[in-house]
Amino acid sequence: MTRLGVLYTANTSSLIPSAEKIAARQGLTLVPILVESNKDLPKAIDSLASTVQGIWSVADPNLFSSKSTRYILLNALRKRIPFMGFSRNVVESGALFALDFDYKAVGFQAGQIANKILAGARPDSINVTNADVLWFHYNENTAKHIDVTIPEELVAVAKEVYR
């Protein structure tokens, strides 16, 4: 895979520049498609289907309603394009895989930050942090349908495998 598409809205446009840099470091070209309204979705999916080998999704509530998510998943499956979801639920519905947060661990991290503030630290002195724990969710049925093989070492560490 060399070209990875991503659908986004104005709500998540700030994520795209850093995602492009990260993708480039991995030898990938990120192909971002701005979706201004759900009416633009069919054209955006068709555009990506002809130019990328996979679609990555950002958790964007303006883009991913239950109806639009179904549409994207159905078209990705029909076109045999791997769709990388943003949650366990999207993988259960047909995305190839997702990295999802362990929300209990995120809550613990938030508590640690709150304790620092309560102990007198200025909020602007606390660095932004990423989640310490991520879960890998994988849909084996989707992998078979689109003829993609996920390395066994990844499958072995999956929190959930949907068969």
Model regions and ranges:
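Short hydrophobic alpha-helices and adjacent helix-cap/hinge residues
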Residues: 1-163
